[in-house]
Amino acid sequence: MSWQTYVDDHLMCDIEGHEGHRLTAAAIVGHDGSVWAQSATFPQFKPEEMNGIMTDFNEPGHLAPTGLHLGGTKYMVIQGEAGAVIRGKKGSGGITIKKTGQALVFGIYEEPVTPGQCNMVVERLGDYLLEQGL
């Protein structure tokens, strides 16, 4: 299965039980910042934004004072799982990032998708990739 298929079929899919509700953008990005696959709507990010995200996984709390930036959009960092998941909020939407052994799985959402639904979609794929040694 190609990385693009993971994004299209496992991240940008309808959310279980909520036909027509889906993430607004998603991607799988290597730890080095290289894009493995992304939705057409995923923002163009700057290398320093990805560096900040990777630093926060290695030093939890790093982004809390400044916020998480992706594609020029600032998200307020909310509770995550140290070293494993970063979550951010902006207005009625937000972002979930799950770290695997080799990649970061990104999901960006807006209402009517809820933070919990985004977390479920992103973390389910991230956990699967971890189980596969990726």
Swiss-Prot record:
Keywords for the protein's UniProt record, in alphabetical order: Actin-binding, Allergen, Cytoplasm, Cytoskeleton, Disulfide bond, Phosphoprotein
Record motif Involved in PIP2 interaction, residues: 84-100
Q: Name one GO molecular function term.
A: actin monomer binding
Signal sequence span is: none
Check the record and name the InterPro entries matching this protein.
Answer: PFN (IPR048278), PFN_euk (IPR005455), PFN_sf (IPR036140), Profilin_CS (IPR027310)
Assembly and partners are described as:
Occurs in many kinds of cells as a complex with monomeric actin in a 1:1 ratio.
Q: Say which family it is in.
A: Belongs to the profilin family.
The misc remark on file is: The variability of the residues taking part of IgE-binding epitopes might be responsible of the difference in cross-reactivity among olive pollen cultivars, and between distantly related pollen species, leading to a variable range of allergy reactions among atopic patients.
Function of the molecule: Binds to actin and affects the structure of the cytoskeleton. At high concentrations, profilin prevents the polymerization of actin, whereas it enhances it at low concentrations.
What name does this protein carry? Profilin-3
